[in-house]
Amino acid sequence: MLADRFTGSGLPSRLMRRVLAYIALTKPRVIELLLVATIPTMLLADRGHIDIRLILATLFGGWMGAASANTLNCVADADIDKVMKRTAKRPLARDAVPTRNAFVFGVVLGLASFAWLWWQANLLSGALVVATILFYVFVYTLGLKRRTSQNVVWGGAAGCMPALVGWSAVTGTIGWPALALFGVIFFWTPPHTWALAMRYKEDYRAAGVPMLPVVATERTVTKQIVIYTWLTVLTTLALVPATGVIYAAVALVAGAWFLLMAHQLYAGVRRGESVKPLRLFLQSNNYLAVVFCGLAVDSVLGWDTIGSFFG
């Protein structure tokens, strides 16, 4: 293990385990969305130009903000994390970190992210990160998650904020392309999350979390997945006027593939077959990464946008 390797080099294993526990609180894998969304958005906002300093500074500030939100989410969800098999090994669920310490850690990260982004970018970017943290903790985690099956629909708005933060860091405003990218992630979140929840619905049921797969039939859930997948793909195409042909081609091809997977899942359920929703969950990550990577390449090349050909 990582801790063992560090122990061998002279660092106490207890200290290393504590450090790794605090890192785990921030949910590093979830923060990957920050990297996927922020960099291409910033490149689009400053089309044809790369400001490495600003990109790195925004990523660091955004990472602290996301880490803060995830840590405070762990604090609020510690009771249900102990019940669910998928989350039982999280630091607070196994008492690897005192709850009070985790709370202070999360708050400090949030304040630091605001101060950093205000200093390195602008006040709007810092304010957007604070709004994201507050929304994720109070609206989603404490308000919606345990009360409605539509929790991830509205609560997922917090995960869309990297697009707004990235755009505002470059321009100091929130332009319509940033809102379109916000919409892409907003509509992508339900099918992505519901596919996972289909696989772990008994976990959610035991924890008392009314995810859609817990309270609705598989046919209803997969139908909703198809609807939101269509909305996701259509929203990616709405961004085309602000981009070039590379992004347009990637969005079309990747969108067709994503739609095919969603429809296959729905068709399998309709036929009464044993389906594998986790496959859609995993591949939806690849879909989003491909679309945003296509946007990044398109933006770096800086070719004329499709919208410019129409005046």
Swiss-Prot record:
It is a multi-pass membrane protein. One of its GO terms (molecular function) is protoheme IX farnesyltransferase activity. Pfam families: UbiA (PF01040). The chain crosses the membrane at residues 19-39, 55-75, 101-121, 123-143, 169-189, 221-241, 242-262, 290-310. Its EC number is 2.5.1.141. GO terms for cellular component: plasma membrane. Gene3D superfamilies: UbiA prenyltransferase (1.10.357.140). Pathway: Porphyrin-containing compound metabolism; heme O biosynthesis; heme O from protoheme: step 1/1. The keyword Glycosyltransferase does not apply. It catalyses: heme b + (2E,6E)-farnesyl diphosphate + H2O = Fe(II)-heme o + diphosphate. The keyword Electron transport does not apply. GO terms for biological process: heme O biosynthetic process. It is an enzyme of class 2 (transferase). InterPro entries: Protohaem_IX_farnesylTrfase, UbiA_prenyltransferase, UbiA_sf. It is found in: Cell membrane. Keywords: Cell membrane, Heme biosynthesis, Membrane, Transferase, Transmembrane, Transmembrane helix. It comes from the Bacteria. Belongs to the UbiA prenyltransferase family. Protoheme IX farnesyltransferase subfamily. NCBIfam families: cyoE_ctaB (TIGR01473), PRK04375.1-2 (NF003349). Converts heme B (protoheme IX) to heme O by substitution of the vinyl group on carbon 2 of heme B porphyrin ring with a hydroxyethyl farnesyl side group. Carbon 2 of the heme B porphyrin ring is defined according to the Fischer nomenclature. This is Protoheme IX farnesyltransferase. It comes from Nocardia farcinica (strain IFM 10152). The gene is ctaB.
